[in-house]
């Protein structure tokens, strides 16, 4: 099929799938457009690059099952706060109930703000959610990844290893297969906390946390890096310090110290892409990257891919008012995927075909490959 023919088919599919997006849309895309959307996160193959970041949209089995049915590639579970065998949590200040999330416009885009932090239910309930996630992962329906906030000491203090031992071991047993896939969260509220006032303290965490987690289980580890309250150069120092991880999620939301809330929108993507644009952020070896921040279109997915990200994590775009999605049927996850993939102007397929026409993305074996975008700008 010619490039112009593909664009015509894309317009037809965009209209046709407004009512219902087929769950196995990556196969349809490959058959119809000869475009391979395969992506990767934490070394695991994905049918396409779009996943859901940790938060209020991944804290119960119903949400995970809806996402699996929609064809989402992966979901990171709500962040649990580590504890020791007695149930003590050094980071207990983060295990508080979330207030209602507020979805609002910010500039030309959208953001979600709320005052709340991590998992506020029992640890046993979290382990049950991990087991549900493992069932979906094992059956190939939805890759799920638990998320943890472990103890982070001040510079002169030791790590509370008892929390690392108990929490990691319990998660590994609930996961049921080696290696345990795990995301370590460095949250926006942490960035706004006094704990994060010192650069040396942050860099120590990033250097030492991976080995402390892996000391207690076979773990494939991703670290979700915060946007620290320092300059772009320090974001690069953080990436370098975190090189012991298997993957990095770049970068968590910004923190408004005055309002006491985290936020996203264009300010977030502008900073993230600017930091990732630097040559020092693109190393041929080291942790793989997963992009996050203001991802509201396939074009933005490509922007992150061109800067080295082999997958992306969204949160806000799955929460828009229903009338903001072009689709008229399906769950919010389905409607979001429909827009991100099939929008004939800014969807992922349209942008890949656009780059093919411009000579900046070539076919291999007759196909365009999403992963060929990585680091390609």
Where are these regions (language model features)?
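Glycine-rich beta-to-alpha transition loops that act as phosphate-gripper elements at the mouths
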Residues: 54-57, 149-151, 225-230, 286-300
């Amino acid at each position: 099929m010619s490039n112009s023919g593909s664009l015509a088919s894309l317009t037809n599919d965009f209209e046709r799938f407004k009512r219902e997006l087929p769950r196995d849309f990556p196969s349809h895309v490959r058959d119809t457009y000869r475009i391979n959307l395969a992506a990767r996160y934490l070394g695991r193959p994905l049918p396409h690059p779009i996943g859901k970041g940790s938060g209020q949209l991944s804290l119960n089995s119903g949400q995970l099952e809806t996402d699996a049915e929609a064809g989402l590639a992966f979901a990171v579970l709500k962040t649990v706060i580590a504890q020791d065998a007695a149930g003590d949590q050094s980071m207990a200040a983060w295990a508080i109930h979330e207030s209602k999330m507020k979805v609002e416009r910010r500039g030309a885009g959208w953001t979600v703000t709320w005052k709340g932090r991590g998992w506020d239910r029992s640890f046993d309930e979290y382990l049950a959610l991990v087991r549900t996630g493992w069932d979906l992962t094992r059956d190939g329906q939805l890759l799920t990844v638990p998320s943890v906030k472990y103890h982070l000491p001040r510079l002169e203090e030791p790590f509370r290893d008892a929390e690392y031992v108990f929490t990691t071991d319990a998660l590994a047993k609930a996961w049921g297969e080696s290696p345990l896939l795990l995301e370590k969260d460095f949250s926006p509220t942490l960035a706004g906390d006094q704990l994060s006032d010192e650069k040396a303290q942050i860099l120590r965490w990033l250097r030492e946390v991976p080995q402390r987690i892996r000391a207690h289980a076979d773990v494939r580890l991703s670290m979700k890096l915060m946007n620290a309250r320092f300059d772009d150069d320090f974001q690069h120092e953080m990436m370098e310090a975190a090189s012991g991880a298997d993957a990095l999620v770049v970068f968590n939301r910004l923190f408004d110290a005055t309002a006491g809330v985290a936020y996203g929108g264009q300010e977030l993507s502008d900073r993230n892409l600017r930091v990732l644009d630097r040559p020092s952020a693109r190393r041929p070896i080291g942790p793989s990257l997963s992009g996050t921040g203001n991802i509201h279109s396939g074009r933005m997915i490509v922007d992150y891919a061109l800067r080295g990200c082999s997958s992306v994590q969204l949160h806000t775009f799955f929460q828009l008012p229903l009338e903001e999605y072009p689709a008229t049927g399906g769950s919010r996850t389905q409607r979001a995927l429909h827009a991100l993939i099939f929008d004939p102007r800014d969807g992922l397929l349209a942008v890949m075909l656009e780059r093919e026409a411009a000579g900046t993305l070539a076919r291999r074996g007759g196909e365009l490959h999403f992963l060929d975008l990585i680091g390609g700008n």
